[in-house]
Regions:
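Internal alpha/beta loop-helix hairpins
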Residues: 1-56
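Non-catalytic connector elements of ABC transporters
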Residues: 33, 42-167
Length: 167
């Protein structure tokens, strides 16, 4: 509910996986969904997003849905949940460089609050079981990490209406 109006009705899974709008997307889930402005492009029938100067192909069901909805190239708000980011390395062309500003140890996972080069703050959630002791020790304030995400886990919102482009 926002401003006295119900925003979406559905099962918890439906609301989490396919939020109707940006408000619902950021409200459901902890930590909240990361959102940032970027462009969606269509090249040879394939969709790409271009956050922070990297090019990531939209794939899987999300690509099919964009095609079926007839979504065209343009400015969007891209949503990526913290658990959908993965650590990468500098050699990956889809890697986004970020500087760690907060490392929250939550027991079975780390919540890394990072700043992208242009100043956007993102939250990256990493299961501690997936890290070596060396990796864990390197994830400290001020260190640079590289993160990326798969094309099948993205959410796409209209920057004017804030509605999900796939609903």
């Amino acid at each position: 509910m926002k401003d006295g109006f119900i925003q979406q009705v559905g099962t918890p899974t439906e609301v989490f996986d396919m939020p109707l709008n940006l408000f619902v997307a950021e409200f459901i889930g902890a930590p909240k969904m990361n959102t940032f402005k970027t462009t969606l492009t269509v090249e040879d029938g394939k969709y790409f997003v271009n956050p922070y100067g990297v090019k990531i192909e939209v794939n899987g069901k999300k690509a099919d849905m964009l095609t079926n909805k007839g979504v065209q190239s343009g400015e969007i708000i891209l949503g990526v949940r913290p658990e959908h980011f993965v650590l990468s390395d500098e050699s990956n062309p889809a890697a986004i460089p970020c500087k760690i500003v907060v490392n929250e140890m939550m027991g079975s996972e780390l919540h890394l609050h990072v700043l992208e080069d242009n100043g956007d703050r993102l939250i990256v959630r990493i299961p501690t079981v997936s890290l070596t002791d060396e990796q864990r020790a390197s994830l400290v304030y001020g260190s640079t990490i590289y993160v990326t995400f798969e094309g099948k886990v993205m959410h796409f919102f209209d920057p004017e209406t804030q509605l999900n482009l796939l609903v």
